[in-house]
Every structure is written in structure tokens, then in C-alpha cells.
Amino acid sequence: MNMAKDIKFSADARAAMVRGVDMLADTVKVTLGPKGRNVVLEKAFGSPLITNDGVTIAKEIELEDHFENMGAKLVSEVASKTNDIAGDGTTTATVLTQAIVHEGLKNVTAGANPIGIRRGIETATATAVEALKAIAQPVSGKEAIAQVAAVSSRSEKVGEYISEAMERVGNDGVITIEESRGMETELEVVEGMQFDRGYLSQYMVTDNEKMVADLENPFILITDKKVSNIQDILPLLEEVLKTNRPLLIIADDVDGEALPTLVLNKIRGTFNVVAVKAPGFGDRRKAMLEDIAILTGGTVITEDLGLELKDATMTALGQAAKITVDKDSTVIVEGSGSSEAIANRIALIKSQLETTTSDFDREKLQERLAKLAGGVAVIKVGAPTETALKEMKLRIEDALNATRAAVEEGIVAGGGTALITVIEKVAALELEGDDATGRNIVLRALEEPVRQIALNAGYEGSVVIDKLKNSPAGTGFNAATGEWVDMIKTGIIDPVKVTRSALQNAASVASLILTTEAVVANKPEPAAPAPAMPAGMDPGMMGGF
């Protein structure tokens, strides 16, 4: 059964949506800048969440009026999209959307053609984005990375953790954020490739106290077959034995007489050998074995390639500087694979990441990428209370995303300053009629983040903007101290990717709202009357269960 619909047209439709845009944007924009305030979100269970993270707040907002709610949801979409692309800048995106919608609406109401305005907005936005990229400064080196992370998280300590993590595992490495048991935030790094499979027999350990097997400069046999018959691998074992180096066997399983034979040789000291099961399942297992082979310079011995264990030679074995195996996991450090082959494999996984639609696949591909690229770092977040912990975790996630974005596309002066810097380029666009109106709307919107940051810190926005326009490039207003400073030197910076995504997403959704002519919403259903009680039934009886 289709629900009845409520429909609003042109000015009515836009006005209702703008009310929703305003409700959401006004709630989110109080968090912008160093003096941004917090917003408290009620949670159905547990303590309320206190946050200044734009996208978290935007996702919580649900309005009663269907038309207003649609406006709010569109802005929430801008915040989410910016968060997905750049991981930060959600509040800036919200402020820009609101500014473009308001300026645009004035002109549409006064009779301008929304399609012309939209064209102008798109042209101006593209010009602003090019200008931002042109003034970007690259970020490299531990100090620069620490500075970017410290600005985003408002904590120098967090900045140090993130730059340390990125230095240790590389820019493509996986950095995860977990909750710590204690009060302190700390960093743990697993270098090399780790997978969740331990030794098949505890008699294979080399250190009885720690119960781990350390293999220095080992050979690695990689196969998706079961090893049950020792005769299958005997020729290989004899060759490895001559080199006096240890061997790691990664196989579907090692059982039958093969396992006790290997263990016996290990105990006698003839031969240092450790066997582990292959990681993953199904197709993912094949891909992971291939990753290990590429990392170590070996070949996967598999029927898919028509290879048999008994025919394998030393050239099929991978090598590494060191391997550590405990009862649950194996870590391969410094595999001997060619850096070119590893780079090609990383590029292949990255292209699969771009095309996959499944979140689960994306997560698994990301893990494989990290393992090939250099390791996994875990930042364990500690805080005195649960509420503080949640808030801290969100801040660190933001900082990590902002830092990655900065390394990718460079940085510009923060605090909305860069958006004012590009005004000159946008103003120079020669456009006519409604297109020119669209450009002017963007020009006005580019001032809005600075205005809001100043307002939140208790300063007069227009005064700050006027002074900023007449200041040398790179000089900006530090809202935390009220001083005029060289923004980048002071460490007040924004990743270009964040600023650019915020502007592009805001312009895109705001122009959609301006070109809306009708809005269709579901009519609220009248509440169904409560069923009458059967005669003679005592209402008190209902509570007896």
C-alpha cells in the first residue's frame, strides 16, 4: 500500500528545505575552530556523547517535519561524503553548504535562473580547487607530519604517536585505533608481514621461556597442498640442510608421518624447521599465499600452476631476514622479494580497492595492502572516563585521516585562510549574467569558515575578513590567541584534500537544493486508536506478568 504524499513547490519547497539545512548547520558550526564549542548527544544506552566532530553530530540529527528533514539530510550527506574522502573537514563543508544555499536562495527568490547560477557555482568551485592545489606545500618528514596530526587532534602527544606510527609502517601501512585498558595512550607496532597462524607443534620452538620460534635468515616453502608424506619434500629438505639455514613451511596442513618426522629432526638438532598452516580461506587464502611469495621472492607451489611438491627446487623457496612464530601468529620481517614486484602487487591491490563495493572485501584488501607495505601500528587510546575515551578516539581518528590526506596532496594555511587566498583567482573569472551571480555566491561562501571561526572565538567576523584580505599571503588570524601570525609556521594548517573536498561537496549539494522545484514527502499517518478492551476485563490484570 502506497502512503499518501505531501508535495511542496518552488519557493515553498526550497524554504522548507533551507529551514532543515539551517537547523543542522547551526548545530554543527558551533564546533568550528580552536575555540569551537562541544555538542552533547543523547544516547539510548550509556552516557551521552560529548563531541566536536561535525559528521558525528550531523548523523544524529533527525527532524520531525519531513521537508525540513530532507534539507538536513542533504547537508548531513555533504559531511559524510567529505569524511569518506578526506576524513576531516566535515564542519567546514557544512558551513560552506549553508552559505552557498543562503546566498543562492536570495538570488533565486529575486528571479535569477537557478540553472545559470548552478553553472557559475560549478565554474567558480573548479577554479578555487585549482588555485588551492597551486598554493599547496608538500608534507614530508617526521616533524611536518607530527605537526599536521597535532593540529587536527589538538594534542602534541597524539601528533607524535601518529607521526611515529606512519614512520614505522609507511604511508600505506595500516594504523588502527583501539581502546586501551589503562589511562595512558600508547603505540604498538608490528613490523613486517603478520598472519594469524602459529606453529603446528610446540616442539618447534627455539626459545622455551617465551615459547616462540625465531628463524634467522630462513628459507620459506609456500604451498596450498597438504604435506602428509615426508618423501614429497625430502629432496628439498636435503638441499636446505646443506645450506645450514632454517626452514619455514607454510602449507594447507602438515600431518600424517610428515609432522612427527620434522619434529624429531628438530629435537635432535639436525634441522631447525617450523611448520604453520596457510592463512585465510578459499580464494583469499590463494591471494595471501601469493602475497607472501611476492614479499619473500618465492613461488606458491600449487596445482593451479601445475607444480608438484616433489619436483620443487630451491628456486621456488622464498627468503627473509627473520621470522618469528608463536602459538597464534607468524611475522615475516624483511622478505627478499624484489621491490618492483612488491610495488606492482601493491598497485594491483589498490586498484581492487577502488572498484570493490563490499565493506568486508575493502577491509581485507586494506589489511593485505598494509602487510605488504610494511606493517601494522596500533594506537591504544587511554582516558580516565568512558565519555572522555570516546571523544579522544574520535579526535585521533580525525587526526589520522587529516595526516594521511596531508601527505597525499600537501597542506595550505589553515583556519579558513586558504579559502580567502583563492578569492582573488575566483573573482578574476569573466562570467556574464546568472553565471556571474553563481561566481559571486561562491566568493561570499569562501569567507564563511573564517567568519564562523572568529565568531566562535568571540571576535567580529567581518573585521577579521577585511584585515585578512589586506594581509600578505600566508598571514592569518589565530583564533586561539587572537593574534595575526604566519599560519604555516605557527602550525595552523589544513590538508588541501580536506579543504578541496569540503568545497566540492558543499557546492555540489547546495546547487542541487537551489535547482529543486518540488519536494515530495510522506504524509504523517494519523495515530491508530488503541483497541477497546473486552468488557469485564480489569486493566490491573495486564500488569501481572
Curated annotation (Swiss-Prot):
Keywords from the UniProt entry: ATP-binding, Chaperone, Cytoplasm, Isomerase, Nucleotide-binding
Main EC class the enzyme belongs to: isomerase
GO molecular function list: ATP binding; ATP-dependent protein folding chaperone; isomerase activity; unfolded protein binding
Catalytic activity of the protein: ATP + H2O + a folded polypeptide = ADP + phosphate + an unfolded polypeptide
Domain of life: Bacteria
PROSITE patterns found in the cross-reference section: CHAPERONINS_CPN60
Places the protein is found: Cytoplasm
Chief place where the protein resides: cytoplasm
Residues that, per the record, bind ATP: 31-34, 88-92, 415, 478-480, 494
SUPFAM superfamilies: GroEL apical domain-like, GroEL equatorial domain-like, GroEL-intermediate domain like
InterPro entries: Chaperonin_Cpn60_CS, Cpn60/GroEL, Cpn60/GroEL/TCP-1, GroEL-like_apical_dom_sf, GROEL-like_equatorial_sf, TCP-1-like_intermed_sf
CDD domains named among the record's database cross-references: GroEL (cd03344)
GO biological process, one term: protein refolding
GO CC annotations, alphabetized: cytoplasm
EC number: 5.6.1.7
Assembly description: Forms a cylinder of 14 subunits composed of two heptameric rings stacked back-to-back. Interacts with the co-chaperonin GroES.
Role of this protein: Together with its co-chaperonin GroES, plays an essential role in assisting protein folding. The GroEL-GroES system forms a nano-cage that allows encapsulation of the non-native substrate proteins and provides a physical environment optimized to promote and accelerate protein folding.
Family, as annotated: Belongs to the chaperonin (HSP60) family.
The protein's name in its UniProt record: Chaperonin GroEL
Gene that encodes it: groEL
